[in-house]
């Protein structure tokens, strides 16, 4: 179970707001880690959350008995391998409408012919795979490959 994960964005408040909308949740400032950070909270009863930091933010270990610290790298790459699949109660057309409103690329894909996702490219650089209720069922019903 993943309770939260973090991504970086040029406009953290905007990106957190869109993720919250996909979840029918809410977005709020989240300053504990980095200045200008926001969080999208799902209305799922489990406090699922996506933390959205300023572009270039890097979490680094702190010395001694201290929390990880956030440092901004001005040379941050535009694209990364980091992505997540998130569930939404919205219909496909609603997800596409949100992406279109924001000016972000979105398209339906069938992963390996097994389950569908809507690729939503936040700020046209960070991938989230959005699964509607039908797609969630396809994903949950996957049979794991046989073990060794």
Predicted regions and their residues:
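Short, flexible active-site-adjacent loop segments at beta-strand->alpha-helix junctions, enriched
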Residues: 56, 90, 110, 124, ...
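Short acidic, gly/pro-rich beta-turn/loop elements at beta-sheet edges
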Residues: 15-17, 60-62, 94-96, 130, ...
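Core segments of cupin and vicinal oxygen chelate
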Residues: 7-58, 97-112, 122, 144-147
């Amino acid at each position: 179970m993943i309770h939260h994960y973090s991504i970086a964005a040029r406009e953290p408040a905007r990106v957190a707001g869109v993720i919250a909308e996909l979840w029918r949740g809410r977005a709020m400032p989240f300053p504990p880690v980095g200045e200008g950070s926001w969080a999208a909270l799902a209305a799922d009863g489990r406090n699922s959350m996506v933390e959205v930091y300023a572009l270039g933010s890097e979490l680094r270990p702190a010395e001694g008995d201290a929390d990880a610290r956030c440092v901004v790298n001005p040379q941050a790459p535009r694209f990364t391998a980091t992505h997540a699949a998130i569930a939404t109660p919205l219909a496909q057309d609603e997800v596409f409408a949100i992406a279109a409103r924001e000016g972000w690329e979105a398209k339906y894909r069938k992963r390996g012919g097994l389950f569908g996702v809507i690729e939503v490219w936040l700020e046209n650089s960070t991938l989230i795979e959005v699964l509607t209720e039908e797609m969630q069922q396809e994903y949950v019903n996957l049979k794991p490959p046989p073990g060794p």
